[in-house]
Amino acid sequence: MFFVISGLVIVNSAAAATAMSFLKGRILRLYPAVWICASLTLIVIATQDVNRRIIKNYLRSITLYPGGPWIDGQYWTLACEICFYALVFIMCAMGQKARMPALALGLSLASTVFIALLYALPDSDILAIFTETAWRAIPFYYGCQFAIGIYIWLLSQARMSRISWVGLICALVTGAAQIYMAGENTSERTLAAAGHSFSPLPAVAIWVAGLISIVASVTYAKQISRLPTALLQSVKTLGSMTYPLYLLHFAIGVQLLDWLTDLEMTPLLALALAVPIVCVMSLAVCKWGEPPIRSVLRLVFDRLGQRVAGLQAKESRV
């Protein structure tokens, strides 16, 4: 679902942007929260252990180095995001923004072929490179999810052709198969580790429900915009919290659970306290941490732009 939303939002952002303004917007969106959250994670980890490996992981995280390993496991998804951003940036730089349907189709077909091969050859070491290593950032495995997001945007713009509908159907079928296969894999590992398994169908149902909610929010955007301002602002804040919450929830959340259970709290009570603590931290990051950093970065970009413009003006006079 994360990548579906990204496909929708990123293509929508690129539609009215130049290549450089798109790049600037992505830097302003990604880096401030990463700098804060990775630093907070490092502080928490340092209470238990700190060594050269952890520092290297931290540096890879704050630079969003796509190869990993990072300070916390979930940063791998940002590597996938950056690869997708690179594709969109290249299209903007080449003046090919009107060909976003072709990008969606390419992602959809590539992902369909890859998932089909993965189903037919589940033990392939070559395919595992693109699912289990840093190379998974290349959008073979997750390309269908990005494609669905792009197709939702195309639907909102009434730009769906017959071939786009074929691409959307491929992406939906492949996406459902991917979720089901991932659920089966998780179930098998749970069976081996804990002695019980579960059906992957609920995961597929949740994914479908998420897609329906995204399509509904785009379809009824005008009606939603007429809701009370206070409600819309609250929803916007909750949306802004999701990014830092995603970056903070695992390492810091687990450490909080350890600390709280060490105080002889029951696991359920520890969880009930850890969740709001991490949510409050996420709110603090998005409301008071990210904005000042973005302001400084904007100032830096503006000054760089002025210098470049000045140099270009001097060269034109020579």
Regions found by a protein language model. Give the residues of each.
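Charged, low-complexity, helix-prone segments enriched in Lys/Glu/Asp/Gln
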Residues: 113-115, 304, 318
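Flexible domain-boundary/linker segments
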Residues: 24, 40, 44, 79, ...
